[in-house]
């Protein structure tokens, strides 16, 4: 996936595309009203997920029905680590260091997420980065048709990878079951 993303974004960089600042294509929202109040999380995945932008991603689940982000697609961006995740389901967050990013009219959020992922943003300083650095960055944006093409293509690959990963896990389980019954 990274190789394909790299190739597609490299193509966009060499083409004559509009140079825009991040602040002109993304809006951000502070997560204050979506913060979880309980720190005891459930493992019941039928509840509301509590998210973080880092590797843990889903910290657990909560039964809190208030303050749930349910406005549709967004990117959660950790202001300290610059980790980010593309989200398309209702959630709550644990940390006030998260920025909730949404695309402005005429821009494809999934495309922007893939572009920012391509850039490999990372932090060595423990400070807030979004307003002071990320919003000021300039990136090359193709027209909305091309944005949608790239976003849809990468999304279809992600779906295929997810399906194949699930099949792989099922095959491993089947193998373990067969091996356990082989020597009975």
Indicate residue ranges for each PLM-predicted region.
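Amphipathic alpha-helical coiled-coil/heptad-repeat segments
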Residues: 1-19, 140-184
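Non-catalytic DNA-recognition/assembly elements of restriction-modification systems
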Residues: 2-3, 7-35, 41-55
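Hydrophobic aliphatic residues
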Residues: 26-29, 116, 182
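Conserved helix-loop functional segments at active or binding sites
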Residues: 31, 121-122, 156, 184
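Short, surface-exposed loop/turn microsegments at beta-strand edges and helix-strand junctions
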Residues: 39-50, 63-95, 116, 128-132
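Pocket-edge structural micro-motifs
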Residues: 52-55, 77-79, 102-103
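Short, solvent-exposed loop/turn elements at domain surfaces
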Residues: 59-61
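Basic, amphipathic alpha-helical recognition segments used for DNA target recognition
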Residues: 82-144
């Amino acid at each position: 996936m990274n190789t394909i993303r790299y190739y597609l974004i490299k193509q966009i960089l060499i083409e004559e595309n509009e140079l825009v600042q991040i602040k002109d294509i993304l809006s951000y929202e502070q997560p204050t009203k979506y913060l979880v109040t309980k720190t005891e999380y459930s493992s019941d995945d039928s509840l509301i997920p509590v998210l973080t932008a880092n590797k843990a991603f889903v910290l657990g689940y909560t039964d809190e029905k208030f303050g749930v982000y349910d406005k549709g697609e967004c990117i959660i961006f950790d202001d300290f680590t610059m980790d980010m995740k593309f989200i398309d389901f209702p959630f709550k967050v644990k940390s006030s260091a998260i920025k909730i990013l949404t695309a402005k009219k005429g821009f494809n959020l999934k495309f922007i997420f893939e572009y920012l992922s391509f850039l490999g943003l990372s932090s060595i300083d423990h400070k807030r980065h979004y307003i002071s650095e990320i919003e000021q960055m300039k990136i090359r944006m193709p027209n909305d048709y091309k944005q949608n093409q790239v976003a849809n293509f990468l999304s279809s690959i992600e779906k295929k990878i997810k399906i194949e990963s699930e099949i792989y896990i099922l095959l491993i389980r089947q193998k373990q079951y067969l091996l356990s019954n082989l020597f009975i």
